[in-house]
Regions:
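Walker A/P-loop phosphate-binding motif and the immediately C-terminal alpha-helix
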Residues: 2-51, 137
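Inter-motif core of Ras-like GTPase G domains
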Residues: 162-181
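P-loop/Walker A phosphate-binding loop and immediately adjacent motor/lid segment at beta-alpha junctions
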Residues: 131-142, 189-214
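Conserved beta-strand segments of the P-loop GTPase G domain that flank and frequently precede/overlap
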Residues: 6-7, 38-39, 111-112, 152-154, ...
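C-terminal boundary of histidine-terminating zinc-finger modules
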Residues: 242-264
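Loop/turn-to-beta-strand initiation segments
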Residues: 105-108, 146-153, 173
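Beta-strand-loop-alpha "switch" segments that mediate conformational coupling across diverse proteins
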Residues: 209-250
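P-loop/Walker-type NTP enzyme "switch/lid" segment
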Residues: 40-142
Length: 271
């Protein structure tokens, strides 16, 4: 069991969330493991648009892992889970009651702060403020790690520095995300000697929305930063980025898996 936390190098668009979604989804399809994605944002969640239609009507998707829910219901998410934690009633196996299932027994998502305010009164808005809920994330990650094989944390800057550091400290692997532009890479290099996160052996550098035709390619970036390990990349892909806006990520990855399987079978038949 392990915690894998995705963080940004700086406050900029790096494709951090979409890189996490791609990696976690692929691992869920390829491996027989229980995986949980935790969103820590208090804004409109990109993770939600990757997997779930914005509706309260439940819809069934038939995948290779059986029936699973692809729509949102109003009880799921960090709001309900935080209430259970405050009342000291939260056990590891109860977390799944507050998640949304992408692939049954494979991949689940714990969404961040619920932005819907249609049915909230003033008292409820105060009780479910992002500041109060932020304090619960550290314990939720710790408890989730006792039940799931892998816990992916999408660490957002809306959490205060102390909470962020506590989550990072209990992480087995930290994926530091950066964009491909020179300014970001230069800042990484300048801070490398003084930044505890950059010096940690648990940290890997990842370039999201990667363009292999840029002069800042993975080979040059690795050399420029003096990295011992090759810098990881998640390439820009139009089909994937469109799927991320249409709750189409699960279907896209399943179709790609089937295509790969068919190609492999054709190759075997030819032999």
């Amino acid at each position: 069991m392990s915690v894998i936390t995705f963080v940004n190098n700086r406050k900029e668009e790096t494709g951090k969330t979409l890189s996490l979604v791609a990696i976690a989804t692929n691992m869920a399809i390829e491996n027989n493991e229980k995986i949980l994605i935790i969103s820590t944002t208090n804004k409109e969640s990109k993770i939600k648009s990757c997997f779930f239609e914005d509706t309260e009507v439940k819809k069934m998707r038939l995948g290779i892992f059986g029936q699973n829910m692809s729509a949102l219901d109003t009880e799921a998410g960090i709001d309900g889970l935080a209430k259970m934690l405050r009342s000291n009633k939260l056990n590891p196996d109860m977390i799944t009651n507050y998640t949304k299932v992408v692939f049954k027994d494979r991949l689940e998502v714990l969404l961040g702060k619920n932005k819907s305010e249609r049915n909230q009164n003033i008292e409820e808005k105060v009780q479910s403020s992002p500041i109060e809920i932020a304090d619960e994330y550290v314990e939720i990650v710790k408890i989730a790690n006792q039940y799931y094989d892998k816990v992916f944390v999408d660490l957002d800057y809306n959490l205060n520095q102390d909470i962020r550091e506590q989550i990072i400290d209990q992480s087995d692997l930290i994926i530091l995300n950066s964009s491909q532009n020179y300014k970001s890479l230069k800042e990484l290099k300048e801070n490398k000697e003084n930044n505890k996160l950059l010096k940690s052996p648990r940290t890997l550098l990842l370039i999201g929305r990667y363009d292999k035709y840029s002069k800042y390619n993975v080979k040059n970036i690795t050399r420029y930063l003096g990295e011992k390990n090759k810098v990881l990349t998640v390439p820009y892909n139009t089909l994937y980025f469109e799927a991320c806006n249409e709750a189409g990520v699960p279907d896209l990855f399943l179709k790609l898996k089937c295509m790969i399987w068919m190609i492999e079978m054709q190759f075997l038949w030819k032999k």
